[in-house]
A protein has these predicted regions:
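Short gly/ser/thr-rich secondary-structure transition/capping motifs
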Residues: 90-97, 133-138
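Conserved post-Walker A coupling segment in P-loop NTPases
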Residues: 14, 27-93, 100, 104-120, ...
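Conserved RecA-like P-loop NTPase ATPase core
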Residues: 25, 47, 70, 84, ...
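Nucleotide-binding/hydrolysis machinery
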Residues: 8, 12, 18-21, 34, ...
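Base-recognition residues in the alpha-helical recognition helix of bacterial helix-turn-helix
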Residues: 125, 129, 137, 302, ...
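N-terminal accessory segments that target, anchor, or regulate ATP-driven/P-loop NTPase machines
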Residues: 1-10, 298, 308-310
Length: 311
């Protein structure tokens, strides 16, 4: 487990950033870290939802208590109840002894339920009771056990859509969303890319090269221009690869080809396709320093088509 510090309000060990979007998240963390209000963390895959949950736990007054992280999507539906709430001997075939679940393991601390949208309806019913009555029952038992834990759930799905299609309980949704923290995608916190890149360069430089590396300004510009569909997880993977491939300074050549030629357009309203296409071609030509053969290769068209599109 990481030991999160509160050296500054926007720094929680593995969480770094200075953008307005990032500070919105850390401001909420500051408000909720010392109470046991139920929290739901939303955001795209790879944005760092578990890091936010850990920051809440380890920066608050319950930091000495257990932090138990569970990915609901990784547990087969028929085992979810037993894994979460425990079971008694003889509850089902193979239940040869009484066994605690994640709820018992998290006693006094925090239970983090990732991918909550994948929880079975049976689990959702028991979870609702745990939140309302602060009590659970093990699989196969009638005995009620009191639970004193903070529940933090996370999802990258739209739970309101899940409610509409009948796969998620509406009453549970409102119980979980006492406090909602939306973790922004990396494309909405571009000013944090250099800080995050530096963190990962330090981490993997020491791990793989036993020394500190640095990144060339033009390579950093490419990282800052890219749209990051895989968010922080994708950035970390790319930096890890670049550290392995580099000779001390991470250069453009150490980055994947896909990053070098992906160009973002500002959303200035709708324009004819030929205008956007021409603008894109011109940007690629700037990138290739006017080399039309190279530009045609990147665009996956022949030179004749390129000439026609530039007319």
């Amino acid at each position: 487990n990481h030991n999160f510090t509160t050296a500054s309000p926007n720094l929680y060990s593995d969480m770094v950033g200075e953008s307005v979007a990032f500070k919105k998240v850390t401001n909420i963390i500051e408000r909720v870290k010392d109470n046991k209000a139920t929290i739901i963390i939303t955001g795209e895959s790879g944005t760092g939802k578990e890091l936010v949950a850990r920051a809440i736990h380890y920066s608050g007054k319950f930091s000495r208590e257990p932090f138990i992280a569970v990915n609901c999507g990784a547990i087969p539906e028929n085992l979810q109840e037993a894994e979460l709430f425990g079971y008694i001997k003889g509850a089902f075939t193979g239940a040869n002894e009484n066994r605690n679940g994640f709820f018992q393991a998290a006693k006094g601390g925090t239970l983090f339920l990732d991918e909550i949208g994948t929880a079975s309806l049976a689990v959702q019913t028991k979870l609702l009771r745990a939140l309302q009555e602060k009590e659970i029952t093990r699989v196969g038992s009638q005995k009620v056990e009191k639970v004193d834990i903070r529940i933090i759930a996370a999802t990258n799905a739209n739970l309101k859509d899940e409610i509409k299609n009948g796969s998620f309980r509406e009453d549970l949704y409102y119980r979980l969303t006492v406090v909602e923290i939306n973790v922004p995608p990396l494309r909405e916190r571009k000013s944090d890319i250099s800080i995050l890149a530096d963190k990962f360069i330090r981490k993997y430089g020491i791990e793989f090269k036993d020394r500190l590396l640095r990144i060339a300004p033009e390579a950093l510009q490419i990282l800052e221009r890219y749209n990051w569909p895989g968010n922080i997880r994708e950035l970390e993977n790319i930096i890890q690869r670049a550290v392995i491939m580099s000779d001390g300074i991470i250069k453009v050549k150490d980055l994947p080809e896909a990053l070098k030629y992906q160009i973002d357009f500002p959303d200035n309203g709708l324009r004819p396709l030929y205008e956007m296409e021409k603008e894109y071609i011109q940007r690629v030509l700037v990138h290739t320093k006017g080399n039309k053969t190279k530009a045609a290769q990147i665009l996956q068209i022949d030179r004749k088509t390129l000439r026609e599109k530039l007319k």
